[in-house]
Regions:
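Structural preference for solvent-exposed beta-strand-turn elements
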Residues: 1-185
């Protein structure tokens, strides 16, 4: 049995997309005393799954569940975040057959089994942005190493508009917060 989720500081985190997708793959889910009992009967079977919106968590869970499912799973309206691509690279290195990660349609051709591998997980862009924000609000300087610059392209102009200066060199980003942050338009 799995415990039902409770959400976080930002609010509730509904899992209906996850449960619906898992059901389409052959998972039978019953609620029992505040928990969920999940069974698969004859195993998981590939299917076409269309998400109502591109959820990162639901896309990841579908990828993980269908990688060893029998047949082909196609995820429509899949999340396109870098974390999806990284998970696909990892699973493919373990023997999976996943294509289309980073696009709105992902195709997973189920395999019988996965094997181990050595893999370096990509840099966490959310953690990097958190440290950048800390430097910005305190007027400090920070250098972040081993980042993926393209994953931060959308936030760098915002920091610049707020008065921060930054310098990219390879996979390192140095950012300096201003004495006083500028309002954003």
């Amino acid at each position: 049995c799995l415990s039902l989720p409770g959400g976080c500081e930002l609010g509730p985190r509904p899992i209906d997309l996850h449960l619906s997708a898992l059901g389409k793959l052959g998972v039978h889910i019953k609620e029992c005393h505040g928990s969920m009992k999940c069974t698969t009967g004859d195993g998981l079977k590939g299917n076409n799954i269309s998400l109502a919106f591109p959820s990162v968590g639901a896309t990841e869970n579908i990828m993980l569940a269908s990688v060893c499912a029998e047949g082909v799973t196609v995820i429509h309206n899949a999340a396109r975040e870098p974390e999806i691509c990284d998970l696909a690279h990892f699973l493919n290195k373990c023997g999976a057959h996943i294509s289309g990660a980073g696009e709105s349609t992902i195709i997973i051709d189920g395999v019988q089994y996965l094997h181990g591998c050595e893999y370096t997980v990509m840099a966490d862009r959310i953690a990097a942005t958190t440290f950048m924000s800390a430097a910005a609000v305190t007027g400090s300087h920070i250098t972040l190493k081993d980042i993926v610059p393209s994953h931060l392209e959308s936030v760098l102009p915002i920091f610049e508009e707020a008065g921060c200066s930054y310098h990219l060199k390879g996979d390192a980003l140095s950012i300096t917060g201003p004495k006083r942050l500028q309002p954003l338009k």
